[in-house]
């Protein structure tokens, strides 16, 4: 199915391919939950409206924009190298294992389960003012930043896993930008491997966040 213009659908099912062509926008607007086993491809835009949950089960290759304006987006496959914007009150859940996407922005919630790593890879400068969350405990979800861009994390994050910066910069104004504080000193909780951590204000980095280089 080829999307070449702006199209709004109330439902989507099946195992086929939805190609989001350049200049095309597919809006899914429904109050009922949608589960899609196929894949999204192409460089167009995917927009999520409605109070429902959209669950993606396929290995998506979409590299345009994904906008979660209302409701929840749950990915049990792979989202693709898409630029993701999550509005306040909406949630993106990474349920399919480690995933790599483009940039993240917006004021919503990103949920990363225990042992899962979400990598954001972009050369763009973006701000995410929402909350990156996950289960509490010693093994939480992990965040990795690659690409040359600057990612500003201005929310109070609660994910309990590690933060790795492989490229570009993560900018924070408080220790809470890096998620929950480990209960004890934890080697590699913050790793700088080709990237930079920027403090945009004066604060004290909790000593339990042991920094590893390389």
Locations of regions flagged by a protein language model:
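Short, conserved catalytic or interaction motifs in soluble domains
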Residues: 155
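Beta-strand repeat architectures
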Residues: 1-35, 41-55, 63-127, 133-152, ...
């Amino acid at each position: 199915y080829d999307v070449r213009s702006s199209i709004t659908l109330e439902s989507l099912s099946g195992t086929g391919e939805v190609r989001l062509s350049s200049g095309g926008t597919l809006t899914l607007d429904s109050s009922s939950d949608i589960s899609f086993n196929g894949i999204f491809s192409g460089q167009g835009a995917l927009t999520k409206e409605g109070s429902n949950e959209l669950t993606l089960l396929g290995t998506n290759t979409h590299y345009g924009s994904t906008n979660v304006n209302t409701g929840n987006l749950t990915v049990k496959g792979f989202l693709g190298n898409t630029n993701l914007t999550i509005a306040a009150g909406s949630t993106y859940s990474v349920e399919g294992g480690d995933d790599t996407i483009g940039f993240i922005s917006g004021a919503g919630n990103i949920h990363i389960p225990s042992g899962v790593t979400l990598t954001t890879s972009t050369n763009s400068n973006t701000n995410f003012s929402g909350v990156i969350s996950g289960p509490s405990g010693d093994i939480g979800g992990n965040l990795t930043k690659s690409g040359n861009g600057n990612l500003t994390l201005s929310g109070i994050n609660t994910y309990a896993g590690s933060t790795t910066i492989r490229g570009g910069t993560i900018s924070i104004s408080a220790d809470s930008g890096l998620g929950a504080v480990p209960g004890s000193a934890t080697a590699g909780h913050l790793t700088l491997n080709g990237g930079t951590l920027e403090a945009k204000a004066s604060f004290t980095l909790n000593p339990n966040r042991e920094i590893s280089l390389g």
